[in-house]
């Protein structure tokens, strides 16, 4: 069962936080691998949930007011968080994705950049924040190239 989460950028730490969406989660902290994150008040949450960003390659639900479904976002400048440490990333991706063969971490970084970050590279925003998507979703990609079926799920 997929939880509904909204993504919020924490500029102080340069990471993208996942926050629960829904009446049952308001006011409760979200406890995850990176620690406990308090849910923001409704007035502090942007209503577009990042729709102003040009993120070609993310599925349609990433910009939904309900938040993305069945997606796991982690972000860091060089993929060096406890969630996506280099030694665990290929194994995690192999278990959670379809259509990808087992690849090295370097190959995965190149794959993500080619599929997800073209617009950010052109606008100079890639260094500020890099988003790595670990997981899948049944929604279609936004302006995605035809060969990329990373978000396809069974």
From Swiss-Prot:
Example GO biological process: symbiont-mediated arrest of host cell cycle during G2/M transition
Gene: X
Record's function text: Multifunctional protein that plays a role in silencing host antiviral defenses and promoting viral transcription. Does not seem to be essential for HBV infection. May be directly involved in development of cirrhosis and liver cancer (hepatocellular carcinoma). Most of cytosolic activities involve modulation of cytosolic calcium. The effect on apoptosis is controversial depending on the cell types in which the studies have been conducted. May induce apoptosis by localizing in mitochondria and causing loss of mitochondrial membrane potential.
Post-translational modification (record): A fraction may be phosphorylated in insect cells and HepG2 cells, a human hepatoblastoma cell line. Phosphorylated in vitro by host protein kinase C or mitogen-activated protein kinase. N-acetylated in insect cells.
Location of region: Mitochondrial targeting sequence: 68-117
Pfam entry (one): X
Oligomeric and partner information: May form homodimer. May interact with host CEBPA, CFLAR, CREB1, DDB1, E4F1, HBXIP, HSPD1/HSP60, NFKBIA, POLR2E and SMAD4. Interacts with host SMC5-SMC6 complex and induces its degradation. Interacts with host TRPC4AP; leading to prevent ubiquitination of TRPC4AP. Interacts with host PLSCR1; this interaction promotes ubiquitination and degradation of HBx and impairs HBx-mediated cell proliferation.
InterPro entries: Transactivation_prot_X (IPR000236)
Listed name of the protein: Protein X
């Amino acid at each position: 069962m997929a939880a509904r989460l909204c993504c919020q950028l924490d500029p102080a730490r340069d990471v993208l936080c996942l926050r629960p969406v829904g009446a049952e989660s308001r006011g409760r902290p979200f406890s995850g691998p990176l620690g406990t994150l308090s849910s923001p008040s409704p007035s502090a949450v942007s209503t577009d949930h990042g729709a102003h960003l040009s993120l070609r390659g993310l599925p349609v639900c990433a910009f939904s007011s309900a938040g993305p479904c069945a997606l796991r976002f982690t972000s860091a400048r060089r993929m060096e968080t406890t969630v996506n440490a280099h030694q665990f990333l290929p194994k995690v991706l192999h278990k959670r994705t379809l259509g990808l063969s087992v690849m090295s971490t370097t190959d995965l970084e190149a794959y993500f950049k080619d599929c997800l970050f073209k617009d950010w590279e052109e606008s100079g925003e890639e260094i500020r924040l890099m988003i790595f998507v670990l997981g899948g979703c049944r929604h279609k990609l936004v302006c995605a190239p035809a060969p990329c079926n990373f978000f396809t799920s069974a």
